[in-house]
Amino acid sequence: MIRETFHTDSKIKQVLFNKKSEMKLNYRLLEARFIDRPNRFLTRAELNGKIVESHLPDPGRLKELLKPGVQILLKQENGENRRTKYSTQAVYDGSTLISLNTLLPNKFTAHLLTEGKINFLKGWDIYKKEATYGKHRFDFHLQKEDEFMFLEV
């Protein structure tokens, strides 16, 4: 189980059963204060004294998390066709950092699996990502010698 998550600059760290693991991101996370959410895919935040709009990749309600004044993490985006210059990556709930980027938890889980940092999954290798079984899709298809298992993050 993940006990604590926190960030420093471009690193996301998680503590699992007192074992630290970190995954370096190829982008910087910018600290901002959440103001409001005009629609499902847009947030407004205060970043370095300026109000900016940011794309929110998670269209869920998130009312328990996105409250005025909470700290959020933004990623600066490049692209001429983008409506916003930022995307909202995570939000703090107290001292716990919660990912709002639906791709990041799978990347981090793959990293932890590869590093052998998840105790109950030691020895299991990633056989395939985004594996299908019948009409279902799973985040990971794992293999340990002649055994196989599906894992959903």
Q: Locations of the language-model features?
A:
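Intrinsic-disorder-associated, low-complexity terminal segments enriched in Asp/Asn/His/Tyr and depleted
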Residues: H7-D9, N18
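Structural detector for short beta-strands of small beta-barrel domains
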Residues: Y27-D36
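Active-site metal-binding core of divalent-cation-utilizing nuclease and nuclease-like domains
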Residues: R28, D93-N101, L121-V153
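Short, charged beta-turn/beta-strand-edge "cap" motif at the junction between a beta-strand
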Residues: D36, Q76-N81
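Short aromatic-glycine-enriched beta-strand elements
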Residues: R40-R44
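Beta-strand/loop nucleic-acid-binding surfaces
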Residues: I51-E64
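Short nucleic-acid-contacting surface segments enriched for D/E, G, S/T with interspersed K/R
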Residues: R61-L73
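OB-fold/S1-family single-stranded nucleic acid-binding modules
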Residues: R82-G94
